[in-house]
Each structure stands twice: as structure tokens, then as C-alpha cells.
Amino acid sequence: MKLPIYLDYAATCPVDERVAEKMMNYLTIDGVFGNPASRSHKFGWQAEEAVDIARNQIADLIGADSREIVFTSGATESDNLAIKGAAHFYQTKGKHIITCKTEHKAVLDTCRQLEREGFEVTYLSPKCDGLIDLDEFKAAIRPDTILASIMHVNNEIGVIQDIRAIGEICRAHKIIFHVDATQSVGKIAINLAELSVDLLSMSGHKLYGPKGVGALYVRRKPRIRLEAIIHGGGHERGMRSGTLPVHQIVGMGEAYRICKEEMATEMPRLKALRDRLYNGLKDIEETYVNGSMEHRVDSNLNISFNYVEGESLMMALRDIAVSSGSACTSASLEPSYVLRALGLNDELAHSSIRFTVGRYTTEEEIDYTIELVKSAVKKLRELSPLWDMFKEGVDMSKIEWSAH
């Protein structure tokens, strides 16, 4: 077993060896290096064919038509293109958008930008298990609502929103429905032929493909129109200009193909590893799972260890790569806004650790992690005066701290 152990697959995945090998054939003079927009010679045709194959592989995984796939630089750009593109195109119909407080920053910050442009945004609070109350969602709809953006699987707590039901509500009210599926594609079966989803964001690197490439699904029937946010050349049917990075697109396509083939065996394996980890940690005193355990992606476990500071626990676990909060926001020492939205107090939010398992995780690594976490929590609590007071039966909520 190699140290450190990687348990942060929700932040990024290593590129699968099969994917890397395939990508190498699309870079040098000996491979296919042409520009897919070069229509006048074989180098361009070969590159275009490679892009078409990848487009089909991505569409196959989500039950879409390959003409509905637009390549981008990643899920952040896909979120921006979907939300800004739809809001700007349909703004004559209304300027109201619905989203949720626990969305990824790529959605929340995009909505904040639209607010500066004169749009109104309703930010729904989730229930304490992280799920959206469908009645609250319905109640937020106004005559001028044009767009709703709700993620499929949350990147921090792994809860699965009911996008089928939300999609049906949106379709009935003629509202465009965008789903950030960065954390769910390849982990949960998605068939867009059966879902009322109009726009869906995806990433390459969260699925063992390369970083720097993603895609946006844009429904054709009923047709969804977007205003471009990147101009120049009219690539990707005018929605996203720029020379296509063939090697990255080929990598993303191959990664999605492998996921489609292996999902039926891989997800039960990951669930068993996640459950093994949970069963090993759940008996530690004062530990709480964040988010619904029932409606949750099989690879995620987010636990708060009360009376332990999350940052110091991560330091004590330096042989294990885990995170507190998401990779995009864990650099700030603020407690996770996702956990705060669930109603957790600052202390519990600060003591949370996210474990996410993946393709290269083994049982041996999980068992090692369980032992290490147990001893680290025990050690850190021995240093904590709060833990002593809690063990002595002091009601912590009644303590008044004086400012120095």
C-alpha cells in the first residue's frame, strides 16, 4: 500500500491509464494533430472524426443525441454558458431565476453576476438533510421565472436531488431547467430521453479524464437557445468559439466510454468501500453524517467529528488526502457554506471531513484510514478543554464566552 492515500476523488481523479494512452495519439506529427475546423485536408478530417467519436461517447453515457453536446473548458464554463446564455437569450420573457444555497460556486457566483445585471434570483434553503423541498420550489415560481438551476449531486455532501420531479415542475411552468451533473455523471444512471432537463453540465476530470475539458448538453427538442459568452469563429454551432483541443476531447470521450462499460460493477464496489468506512467510523462518539444517507451518491461520506477542529484533523491525517469543504473553497478558513445551509453550527461545520472513494481505492486503504482517523480524533480530543467539559456533562450551548 502506497502512502499518502487518495480519498479526495470529488476534487479530481487521476487520468485513467487507458485514457492517457489514447490521448497520446492526438498530439505529435506521428499522430492526429490537425485542427478539426480545417475542412480542406485529411489532417483536419481525421481530427474532426476523433471529435465526433468522443461526442457520441459522451452522449451515449447520458442518453442524449451527439448534436446536443457542446464542448467547453470544463464544468465551470458549462455552468456559466448555460445560466448566462439562457438568461440573456430569454430575458424578454422574464428576469427571475431559481437556484439553491448549496449549489457549487460556479452556479452561485454566476447567479450573483446576473443579479448585478438586473436579474432577480431566489436562493432556496435545503432541508436539514440537504434535499430541496419540492413544495418550496413550486412556491418560488413566479410568472417571470425563466430558469432554474439545481445540481444533481452535491460536491460536498453527495446528496442526490430529485431532478426528475423538479424537471417535471419546470416543464409544466415552461421554465428552462439547468442541472450541474459534474458529480453524478458516470456514478448515477442518467437518461436524458426520459428527463425534463434542458441543460446539463459535465466535466472531464471528475471521471478519470483530463482537466481543462468539459461539456454542456443543450436540448434540441424542445429546442433551447443560448447566447454565446465566448465569441470568435462560431465553433460548436455558434455556442462556444475556439479551436477544439482534440487530445483532451478524445480523453474525455474515452473516459466516458469506460465509465459506461464499468459503472454497473464499479458503483457497487465503491458503495461497499464507502459503507466499510462509515461502519468503521460511526461508533466514534459525537460523530454526525452530513446530508441524507438514503439519497446519496455511493462514493461520498461527509462526517463531522464534534469537538475536533477540521483543519487540525486534516493535519493529523497527513497520510490521507481528504478535504474539509470543497477544493474550490477549502483554501478559505470560513466554515463550509453548504453545511451552514443545512443548519449546522460553526463548530460542527468546522469539524467536517469529506471522504470520497474512487476507482483506485482499496479495502486495505479504507481499513488503514479507519484506524488513523480513530486515533487522531482521540488524540485531538484529549487536548480539547471543550471535550473535557462535554464529558463532565456541561451543557455546551449555555456557556457564555467572554471576549478578550
UniProtKB/Swiss-Prot annotation:
Q: Which domain of life is it from?
A: Bacteria
According to the record, the segments passing through the membrane are: none
**Could you tell me what reaction this enzyme catalyses?**
(sulfur carrier)-H + L-cysteine = (sulfur carrier)-SH + L-alanine
Catalytic-site annotation from UniProt: C328 (cysteine persulfide intermediate)
Q: Which UniProt keywords apply?
A: 2Fe-2S, Cytoplasm, Iron, Iron-sulfur, Metal-binding, Pyridoxal phosphate, Transferase
Instruction: Write out the residues that bind pyridoxal 5'-phosphate.
Output: A75, T76, N155, Q183, S203, G204, H205, T243
| Coiled-coil intervals, chain numbering | none
Q: Which InterPro entries match?
A: Aminotrans_V_dom, Aminotrans_V_PyrdxlP_BS, Cys_deSase_IscS, Cysteine_dSase, PyrdxlP-dep_Trfase, PyrdxlP-dep_Trfase_major, PyrdxlP-dep_Trfase_small
Query: In the record, what terms sit under GO molecular function?
Result: 2 iron, 2 sulfur cluster binding; cysteine desulfurase activity; metal ion binding; pyridoxal phosphate binding
Which residues of the sequence carry a binding annotation for [2Fe-2S] cluster? C328
- Give the UniProt subcellular location, in the record's own words: Cytoplasm
| Named cofactor requirement(s) | pyridoxal 5'-phosphate
Asked if Protease is a keyword of the record, the answer is: no
GO biological process terms held by the UniProt record: [2Fe-2S] cluster assembly
Q: In which pathway does it act?
A: Cofactor biosynthesis; iron-sulfur cluster biosynthesis
Any one GO CC term of this protein is: L-cysteine desulfurase complex
Q: Which Pfam families match?
A: Aminotran_5
Modification sites for N6-(pyridoxal phosphate)lysine: K206
Query: Recorded E.C. number(s)?
Result: 2.8.1.7
**Enzyme kind, highest EC tier:** transferase
Q: How does it assemble?
A: Homodimer. Forms a heterotetramer with IscU, interacts with other sulfur acceptors.
UniProt xrefs under NCBIfam families:
IscS (TIGR02006), PRK02948.1 (NF002806), PRK14012.1 (NF010611)
The record, for HAMAP family, names:
Cys_desulf_IscS (MF_00331)
Outline what the protein does: Master enzyme that delivers sulfur to a number of partners involved in Fe-S cluster assembly, tRNA modification or cofactor biosynthesis. Catalyzes the removal of elemental sulfur atoms from cysteine to produce alanine. Functions as a sulfur delivery protein for Fe-S cluster synthesis onto IscU, an Fe-S scaffold assembly protein, as well as other S acceptor proteins.
**Family named by the database record:** Belongs to the class-V pyridoxal-phosphate-dependent aminotransferase family. NifS/IscS subfamily.
Name of the featured protein: Cysteine desulfurase IscS
Its gene name is iscS
